[in-house]
Design a protein with these regions (language model features):
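Active-site bordering "gate/hinge" segments
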Residues: 1-154, 162, 171, 175, ...
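B-type heme-binding environments
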Residues: 157
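Solvent-exposed, well-ordered loop and adjacent helix/strand elements within mature globular domains
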Residues: 174-196
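Cysteine/selenocysteine-centered motifs that mediate thiol-based redox chemistry or coordinate metal-sulfur cofactors
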Residues: 189-219
């Protein structure tokens, strides 16, 4: 038996779905959630897992994602992800550098890291699809982040980070403000660096959608 449930799009990712969605999620063995706003960090998803439901969340998924990263060999994705996680678990500190000037470092607390392998096979498990990254909280990250190409705010150039929070932003020459600065002013909490991860899905390509881009092998 299967059932299709539609509901009005909420305002933000992580917003709770309206009734009867949470109760419906607990009634089935598997929930596949191709939504515009993510259900991953919701009580509805957590309660469904407690009831034994396997949940796959696919926020903002589109045809291009269906035809690329979702068709990956997920046993291979799992192998790469587990190896990457193993390297992280053996490390005390991570340092990220790029030719354009990025230089960031932070301590590794492996207990905060999650292996997003795409394997959602046991009762009560959940995952974000397409999958392919070990990710976690970069404790007290410090340094400089250079934005080579950032479509959301093309005028932004360099971000200074101290103790896990953005403290300064430099724009391209001749430009006084950026969309990123406006976002920081509107949502002060968005200055906090909440996640570090790197992609482990060989079939994921950069398309301008975070759901897939963060899973691309090499990012």
């Amino acid at each position: 038996e299967h059932q299709l449930v539609n509901y009005e799009e909420p305002e933000s990712h992580g917003a709770e779905p309206p009734e009867p969605v949470p109760e419906k999620m607990k009634e089935f063995d598997v929930v596949v959630a191709p939504t515009m706003k993510s259900l991953t960090h919701t009580d509805a998803r957590k309660e469904a897992n407690k009831a034994g439901t396997r949940v796959a969340t696919l926020p903002t998924v589109g045809r291009e994602i269906w035809n690329t990263s979702l068709k990956a060999d997920y046993q291979r994705v799992e192998e790469i992800t587990e190896k990457a996680y193993e390297l992280l678990s053996e490390s005390e500190e991570v340092r990220i550098t790029t030719p354009s000037g990025t230089d960031l470092s932070f301590k590794v607390d492996i207990d905060t890291y999650h292996r997003d392998t795409g394997m959602i096979q046991e009762k009560g498990e959940y995952g974000n699809l397409p999958a392919g990254e070990p990710n976690g909280y970069p404790e007290k990250i410090n340094g400089t982040l250079v934005l080579d190409h950032f479509p959301f705010s093309p005028s932004a150039k360099k971000v200074e980070i101290k103790d896990g929070k953005v403290v300064a932003l430099e724009n391209k020459q001749g430009e006084n403000s950026s969309e990123l600065e406006k976002s920081f002013e509107k949502y002060p909490c968005s200055k906090k660096i909440a996640e570090f991860g790197f992609g482990t899905n060989p079939e994921a390509k950069l398309i301008g959608n975070t759901l897939q881009d963060e899973k691309a092998l090499g990012t």
